[in-house]
Amino acid sequence: MSPNTGESNAAVYASSTQLARALYGGDLVSWIKHTHPGISLELQLDVPVKLIKPGMSQTRPVTVVRAPMGSGKTTALLEWLQHALKADISVLVVSCRRSFTQTLIQRFNDAGLSGFVTYLTSETYIMGFKRLIVQLESLHRVSSEAIDSYDVLILDEVMSVIGQLYSPTMRRLSAVDSLLYRLLNRCSQIIAMDATVNSQFIDLISGLRGDENIHTIVCTYAGVGFSGRTCTILRDMGIDTLVRVIKRSPEHEDVRTIHQLRGTFFDELALRLQCGHNICIFSSTLSFSELVAQFCAIFTDSILILNSTRPLCNVNEWKHFRVLVYTTVVTVGLSFDMAHFHSMFAYIKPMSYGPDMVSVYQSLGRVRLLLLNEVLMYVDGSRTRCGPLFSPMLLNFTIANKFQWFPTHTQITNKLCCAFRQRCANAFTRSNTHLFSRFKYKHLFERCSLWSLADSINILQTLLASNQILVVLDGMGPITDVSPVQFCAFIHDLRHSANAVASCMRSLRQDNDSCLTDFGPSGFMADNITAFMEKYLMESINTEEQIKVFKALACPIEQPRLVNTAILGACIRIPEALEAFDVFQKIYTHYASGWFPVLDKTGEFSIATITTAPNLTTHWELFRRCAYIAKTLKWNPSTEGCVTQVLDTDINTLFNQHGDSLAQLIFEVMRCNVTDAKIILNRPVWRTTGFLDGCHNQCFRPIPTKHEYNIALFRLIWEQLFGARVTKSTQTFPGSTRVKNLKKKDLETLLDSINVDRSACRTYRQLYNLLMSHRHSFSQQRYKITAPAWARHVYFQAHQMHLAPHAEAMLQLALSELSPGSWPRINGAVNFESL
C-alpha cells in the first residue's frame, strides 16, 4: 500500500477522516479480509498476546503481530523463543534503540535464553554471532555470511525499526536498507510486532513472501493500566501559577494557597503535589522538563529528571522518587510496571524539530500503571503554523463516527490529502532504496503534521484510542461526544492560550540560564572549540561573543542553521559549487560533519554531533536556488547589525520564478508541507482551513494575494534554514541607519540611488532637504532580513577572507581532494584529466 507503488488502498490517502487511522493500523482487519484473504488472520480479543508454538500445523514462516502497548507482546516472544531455540538455531534481533537493545538482552537473560550477544558488547567491528541483537544503524556491521544464514529474524517494534531509516543518525542508509530488505526476503522465520503495524507493512511482506506464508495476529487487549486510563487535554497551562511559584511573589509566599485554583496544568499539578501524590511528568522538550522540575522542587526534593543532559538510571530506581520528569529519552524498551505513581502530566509541544506524535505516544506508555488512572495533558501550539502556507489535512475520525463533518470541510481536506500524496510521490525519487522509498509517505506525514496543531492532536488521539485510552477535552467531555464545531473551538482556545504564554515561557527560560563569567575549557574540549572556530568563524570574534555562540548552539535548531549559513556562504564564494554536484558535495560534507561544542545553561561544555543528510542531490538543488536569491538580494548575514533591507517586489519576482520548485525542495529537506498557492488562495479553502486549525480570525480576513504568499514563503525558508527573521521595514529610507543619524555620505548615496541631481547641494542641510523632497521615491514596501547574532561571526563572503584565513585554508584543503574532472568546464576550458 505504498503511495508510489500503485497501492490497492489508494482511497485511504484521499480521506481526511480515514488517513491517520489507516497509517497506524486501525483498519488492518477489514483491509486484510478485503485485500489479502489468503493471509491467515487471528483475532485475539481482550486477552494478552499468544504466539503459535513452533512446529504446530498453523505455523507459517512470517508472523506479524499488531497489539497495543501493555498487551504482552515481548512476553509472548520470550515464551516462543523458549520453545523454538534449539542448539543449532540462529537468531537475529533488530532493535530500534540502544536502550531497547539493553532491555531486550536483560529480559532474554532473565528468561534463560542463552547465547545472545549485543552489538554494544562486541569486541569486533564486523559481527557474525549466531545469536545477535543489533540496532538498525549497525546492521551493516553484520557479516554477509551471517546475514544470509540466520534462521529467525525478530523485529520487535517493527514500525519504529523502519522509522529509524529516516533518522539523522542513519549514516549508511543504502547499505542498511538493502540488508534489512534482504533479511525480510530470505529469512526462514520472521516475527514482526508493533502497536501500529499497518497495511503498508503487510503489503510489503505479502509481496516478498506471499499471502500463504503469513500469519497475522491482531490483539485488542490493552491491559488494565491503559484501558481504564483517561487523558484530559487541558485548555490552559496556568502560566501565572508557574511564575508565582518559581519567583515566589509576595501574594503567593505560601504555596499552599494554590489549592484554591483549579483547571490549569500547573494548578492541578500543584494540587496533587500538595496532597502528597507521586507524579510522573512527560515533557516533549528539554527546556520544559527543567522548568517543571524547578516548579516541583518548591513542593518536594524527591525528584528524578531524565533528559538528554542527565544520566539515565535503572527503571527500578524510579520507585524511590515522588516526582519523575522525563523526555523522549525514555521510550520503547523501558517500562515501569509498579503501582507507584498516582497521576501523569504531559506537556507536548509540536514543532518541526521536535519528536513526532508516535514518539510522544510511545513515551507516554512507559509508566504502565497509574493509581488514579489519569493523564493531564497540555498541548502547546505556539510553534505550529496557520495560513497562508499551512493547512490541516485531517478530520478527527472519532468525531466523524458520531457526527458528520460539513461536506465543505471534507471536500477541502480530502483535496489537501491528495495534494500531499502527490508531493510525497515526487519526493526522494533518486533514492536507490527499497524500504526508505516505500515507507516515505508515513515518515513525511508524521513530520509535516507537526506544523499543524489540529493534525498533531488528531494523530495523538488516534494513537491513544488504539490503546483504549479515553481522550477528554477540558470543559467539553469525552471526545466521542464532541461535535465538529466544539472541537474546532477547542483547538482555537488551545492556540490562543499557547500564543498568550509563549513570550512568558521564553522569559522564564532565559531567567533560568546561568550568567557565565568563566570561560576556560581545557584538554579535549579546548581542542574541539579551537577546531570549530577555525572551521566556521572569523578570527575577530572575542571571548564574550564566543560564549554567546556556544550558548546559542545549545538549542538544537540553531546547529543546522549555522551549518547552512556556512554552506551558503561557500556556495556564493565558490560559484562552481552551483554548477557541479561533486564540488557542492565536498563543501557540504566539509561543513556538515564533525562536532559542535555547545554550552548549556549550567556552564558545562558538551559535544553535539553534526549529522549529514542522505539526500544531497535535493540539498544541492535547494542551495543553488538559495544562493541565487541571496546574491540577487545582496543578503550578507555577517554585515554589521546582521540586517539587510530588500524590496518586496524583488522577493516577489524571485519567488514567482522559483516558488513552486522551492516548495517541493523544502518538503524533502525541511519536512515542511507548504499548501500550494493555487489551493489555499481561494475563499472556501482559506476560511475552512483557518476554522479547522483554530485560526478563527483567518475566516474574516481577506484572502492573501500571491504577492503576500511569496513573502510568507521567503520568510519561512530564510527563518528555518538560516535563522533569519524577515519583517516589514518601518524606516523611511533603506539601510539600518535612522534618518536623524544619516551622515552626509549616506545622503549622497541615497540621492544617487534614485538618480537625483545633487550638484547644487554643498551642505548637509541642503542634501537633507533635497532627500526629504524626494522621499516619495522610497515609499515602496521594504523588508528587513535580520540574521541571528551568531551569524555576524560566520565566514560568509570572499572579502572576509583575511579575517578567516584558517576557515578558508581548511575549505581549500578539502576541495583539493577533488579530481580535476569534478570541476565544471565552462567557456571552453580544457579538460586536463583527458590529456
From Swiss-Prot:
The record ties this protein, via Pfam families, to:
Herpes_ori_bp (PF02399)
Concerning Gene3D superfamilies, the annotation shows: P-loop containing nucleotide triphosphate hydrolases
Which keywords does the record carry? ATP-binding, DNA replication, DNA-binding, Host nucleus, Nucleotide-binding
Single annotated GO MF: ATP binding
Question: Binding residues for ATP, per the UniProt record?
Answer: 67-74
Which domain of life does this protein belong to?
Answer: Viruses
Subunit organization: Homodimer. Interacts with the major DNA-binding protein. Interacts with the helicase/primase component 52 and the polymerase accessory protein.
What is stated as this protein's family in its record?
Answer: Belongs to the herpesviridae OriBP family.
Q: What is the lineage of its organism?
A: Viruses, Duplodnaviria, Heunggongvirae, Peploviricota, Herviviricetes
**Where in this chain does the record put each Helicase ATP-binding domain?**
54-215
Its subcellular locations are:
Host nucleus
Indicate where this protein is primarily found. host cell
- Which GO BP terms sit in this record? DNA replication
Instruction: State the GO CC annotations.
Output: host cell nucleus
Query: Which InterPro entries does the record cross-reference, listed alphabetically?
Result: AAA+_ATPase, Helicase_ATP-bd, P-loop_NTPase, Replication_origin-bd
Which protein are we looking at?
Replication origin-binding protein
Cited function: Functions as a docking protein to recruit essential components of the viral replication machinery to viral DNA origins. In the presence of the major DNA-binding protein, opens dsDNA leading to a conformational change in the origin that facilitates DNA unwinding and subsequent replication.
